[in-house]
Amino acid sequence: MGYDDVITHLGEFGPYQKRIYYLLCLPAIVCAFHKLAGVFLLAKPDFRCALPYENGSIYELSPHLWNLSYPENERCSYYDVDYTEEYLNGSIPRSSNETKTCSSYVYDRSKYLNSAVTEWNLVCSRSLLSATSDSLFMLGVLLGSLIFGQMSDKLGRKPTFFASLVLQLIFGVLAAVAPEYFSYTISRMIVGATTSGVFLVAYVIALEMVGSSYRLFAGVAMQMFFSVGFMLTAGFAYFIHDWRWLQIAITLPGLLFLCYYWIIPESARWLLMKGRKDEAFVIIEKAAKENKVEVPNEIYEQLVDEVAEKKKQDEMAASQPAATVFDLLRYPNLRRKTLLIFFDWFVNSGVYYGLSWNTNNLGGNQLVNFMISGAVEIPGYTLLLFTLNRWGRRSILCGTMMVAGISLLATIFVPSDMNWLIVACAMIGKLAITSSYGTIYIFSAEQFPTVVRNVGLGASSMVARVGGILAPYLKLLGEIWRPLPLIICGALSLTAGLLSLLLPETLNKPMPETIEDGENFGKKPAPQETAEEGGTQELSGMLNGKSG
């Protein structure tokens, strides 16, 4: 008897669960605002050096004046000459080819009235600061997953959700009024941390209250709400051209979720784990009433017994050495699978965010590119609902990553004047990597043994965040050669897809429970039976020696 059996009596996805679930999906939209708005907050418009004779700030110059003032393909310096009227009229030749570094800039404000880049001149020698700001935001996401993950397990899902939501509101506004780059970046980093508290905790509450047969749908559908937020971010940027007002606009919708304090319950599953059975039973009874079902009294009695038994098991487990990531790296087959999974997580996160933040470098309408990049995620996630339990996890993971790699690498051969085809290849890659990213969550959970599953998933998530932290620097490479970010993402995706063929399929296979199960899972049989038996006995001896 377990809590999943209680959900079976309540209805795996009854009216009560649906109401709470869809309310919990809405914060994913706001978290998408914060994660992706950096594309517009730190938008880099066309720019040039302000020339010594200029008093205005009009970006456009005639081709004649441009050739007289700037070296070819150079935006961060200008010719160090005497800009007299005769020189500008072309009456006298240029006296020197020496250049001078810019001290101020003129920006093309036809698309962006004001961004953090234009306000603090984050171009040329300071362009690295723009990518660093996004990178530190993703570092905040990593730290938030560690901090708020621990908080939600110890203090509860609901308090953690609202603590992170309040912090998100406060530091979202502080980022908008930041007087300089440093305070803006720190505020945004804290906002990044809170997205883990808001989104991931809501995700956990939602999945903990639905039945097992609906969890794939529930997990994928919540990701689709994130994709909706992705697209809506472009809508905000279309109407709001000043970065400070844009930051406020994406923050204020979070105020609506404060009313959830009186609507969203604590996770009954978590309450039972903590021995707070009376509070859990109140929530179960409320759900039963709304679902118009009755939960038999013996169910509650069995739950009480289970809670007592679980407490004993936890006390026994606490006396044993805690599982660590080194347990996954100790044995050859398990180590090989773990490193492959880590690489898949790194690539999926890096490529996903690399493509999401690179839409401004694709050419064409930047807002349209960004919106399409969010829209293609919907079919990417929908694909999983119809294929993941039919075709297998490995087939989907490898197939989607290879499709992403091939489509992105194909941009090498696309002529520069066929911009629509470059965008199309990039969006096919984005759709495919979205499907891959959704698959790796399930696939890796089924690869790790039960005794170290949480450790393995936590380590995988951290490796993924490293990919996200590095992703903002990819778009800087587009200044060297525009297709370069797509080529790097494509090469990584194709490599990871091919290497994933070395992982065993997990569909309809029992998940490994012990370290020994994990080591043997997917291992090729030895050529001789005696060799196989000897290897198994040796491994068992190693494991028994470790546990002793």
UniProtKB/Swiss-Prot annotation:
Keywords from the named record = Glycoprotein, Ion transport, Membrane, Transmembrane, Transmembrane helix, Transport
For this record, the Gene Ontology CC terms, alphabetical, are: membrane
Entry's transmembrane regions: 23-43, 128-148, 159-179, 190-210, 220-240, 245-265, 338-358, 367-387, 396-416, 420-440, 454-474, 483-503
Task: Report residue spans for region: Disordered.
Answer: 512-548
Localisation: Membrane
* Primary localisation category: membrane
The signal sequence is: none
Residues annotated as glycosylated are 55, 67, 89, 97
Q: How does it sit in the membrane?
A: Multi-pass membrane protein
One GO BP on record is: monoatomic ion transport
Q: Which InterPro entries match?
A: MFS_dom, MFS_sugar_transport-like, MFS_trans_sf
| Extracellular compartment residues | 44-127, 180-189, 241-244, 359-366, 417-419, 475-482
**Which sequence ranges are listed under topological domain Cytoplasmic?**
1-22, 149-158, 211-219, 266-337, 388-395, 441-453, 504-548
GO molecular function of the protein, one example? transmembrane transporter activity
Tissue pattern of expression reads: Expressed in embryos and adults at low level. Expressed at higher level in third instar larvae.
What exactly does this protein do? Probably transports organic cations.
The family this protein is said to belong to: Belongs to the major facilitator (TC 2.A.1) superfamily. Organic cation transporter (TC 2.A.1.19) family.
Q: What is this protein called?
A: Organic cation transporter protein
Gene from which the chain derives: Orct
